[in-house]
A protein has these predicted regions:
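Alpha-helix capping/helix-boundary segments
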Residues: 41-42, 93-94, 150-152
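Acceptor-binding helix/loop patch of EC 2.4 sugar-transfer enzymes
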Residues: 112-128, 157-158, 163, 176-178
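N-terminal strand-loop element at the rim of the active site
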Residues: 8-66, 154, 165-166
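Donor nucleotide-sugar binding/catalytic pocket of nucleotide-sugar-dependent glycosyltransferases
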Residues: 54-55, 135-179
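Short beta-strand scaffold positions
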Residues: 37, 88-89, 146-147
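Short His-centered aromatic/hydrophobic patch
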Residues: 89-95, 113
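Nucleotide-sugar donor phosphate/pyrophosphate-binding loop at the beta->alpha transition
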Residues: 17-18, 66, 70-73, 108-110, ...
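Active-site proximal beta-strand in glycosyltransferases
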Residues: 4-6, 102-119, 134, 145, ...
Length: 179
């Protein structure tokens, strides 16, 4: 039986446009790749790559604790169903709630911080809440990837990363210009 990898994101189009090569490389390495994202019209394209897709209900920009709690429960159930060898998370809600679900299920996971977003731009109660959520979501990550040094410095300064947490700054992501 193939080992599986679960990829959590908040956008099927973003996953397809910016992470298609990652998905393909994982499958070429022999993994069964599961993808959990909301369906905005790209899930069929992701399925055609060979991935197993799990449509996910998520408010990308909302801050409703009940809906976010449902997302956390959905991730927990998905982990129990798939039993992945590892989980890759992208974007804020999958990073936070996927990270918590993985830690509770004792599933190894990697976090990718693609940017900090507008909620972390200004000091205040909302920033404090998001920092606390990030700290909780990333506390068990095997590695946290950043796309620039500034985001890494911010997360360190705010105490979102434990000293033992491995971090890497990668050269970012983008659209494959050859397609």
């Amino acid at each position: 039986m193939k080992q599986s990898v679960l990829v959590l994101g908040n956008s099927d189009s973003g996953l397809y446009d910016f992470r298609k090569e990652v998905l393909t490389a994982l499958m070429q390495e022999g993994y069964e790749v599961h993808v959990s994202v909301p369906d905005t019209g790209y899930l069929e394209k992701i399925k055609k790559l060979g991935c197993i897709c799990h449509e996910t209900v998520m408010e990308r920009r909302g801050m409703n604790p009940l809906k976010d709690g449902k997302l956390l429960l959905f991730y927990r159930k998905l982990l129990k169903t798939i039993h992945p060898a590892a989980v890759l998370t992208y974007t804020i809600k999958p990073n936070i709630y996927g990270g918590v679900a993985c830690r509770l299920a004792k599933v190894p996971y990697l976090v990718n911080i693609t940017g900090l977003g507008t909620t972390l731009e200004h000091d205040g109660p909302l920033q404090k809440l998001i920092v606390l959520l990030y700290r909780t979501g990333m506390s068990g990550a095997g590695c946290v990837f950043f796309q620039n040094e500034q985001n890494l410095a911010f997360m360190r300064q705010k105490g979102c990363l434990k000293k033992r947490t491995k971090t890497r700054v990668i050269s970012g992501s983008g659209v494959n210009l050859e397609e």
